[in-house]
């Protein structure tokens, strides 16, 4: 069997799951230059295939594996909601299986992205670009964008599953998995070859469109080197640092840090000078919006002053357990063990952080705060209140930084002291919610879903370089790089607790990664790089100390489809 036959099966299965389709659309059995490629637009239609898949791939199941398995985010059972046969428990406790849908969908999505990129490359290689009003430089750019996005999908596969089957064409016969080192080398070659042929951003703040430019491909190569210690057991931090310095220095295009904390995430973030690669999103067109229903309460539309009810699922990992504290407008994000002592990953060292406010839309594209926490009355219209529908039916929801069955005190439990705080103990008001992508109100409803999803931004380059400097022993330089980003989070840049050579260690570095990139789908990878993913405790998670869990299992369905594929150790 050839790879393209697997593609057909995958695409067919995906079609059955699609929410809608155009039954009048015409399809052709094959794409040939004389029947399809008659204009420049036709080449972009083919180039877009893997990028459309990438837009879907960035969210949902991949995000779950990166965030809900870590100290950052969690999806507890809330009464009768969100148990889902224990699949979210398995993420939190690291007891997933080869048949769990998040694992299956991620493996299929990864290989599907690779196959779509290879298929598009095969179609475009035979096109005479000059004959349709383009030129050879544009063709080289297109082909190498496809090489770069192929490398992206292979790197995600390497991160999630280890060595992947390596294909060069959709006509290749099915093959066994290559080793992690071979997969790493393949990714490196694809990116090194692609970078020189890609276009370069020359205007600061020019709108990003989702396509891959030189800086994006260079950043992907930097990521590969950055995580080499986890991927292949070798340190390549020096190579990563060199690329990061070049990106910051403008070698691969014109970028700079945004002057505000919200710039990379706002309604017009496609023009932020910081964004390097984004998933485009625009109201009523191509909308990137999967996250909304999963994060927010059933009635959160009242708080936001907008339509659309939520599913009330995901939340920041709780820090208060069963303690009833005073009002908190910050999130003590996580507690893990540090050398036998409790250590908090939190915002408490930065109480003047401009992000540490309840989210509020101010009108005219402006907003403040990054969290839903506390009383969920609309701050702009007190008559709109987020009312409970379950344990707190008819009452204004008060989101708390804790998980426990407080509604059952006096009935099932005599006092708060008897409560437990586990994945089974959530209520509808449990947990602080993240608002990384802003929401307008009905007056500005056409702005909804306009924020693009930033996949790579310059802050990440600064942080990668900082960690490389830390590992090289230059804590002062590392601290300076982090502080260049941190400063914008405080009024007038007055950071009450900047990073210094004295307070910077592996835990503070991980802390800074989480605070800046909270909810951006990278936490698992950062923990693995520091050997913390399977060795540390947080909230209801006890470490298994099983390094096999740094990788997910190959789905049984993938092994059944290709019996040359072997399972990962420990599964």
Ranges and model annotations:
Residues 3, 17-41, 151, 187, ...:
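Bacterial Sec-dependent N-terminal signal peptides
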Residues 37-48, 52-57, 80-161, 173-185, ...:
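Conserved, well-structured interaction surfaces
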Residues 156-160, 165, 202, 227-233, ...:
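Short coil/turn linking the two alpha-helices of tandem helical-hairpin repeats
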Residues 20-23, 82, 97, 110-113, ...:
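Long, intrinsically disordered, low-complexity segments
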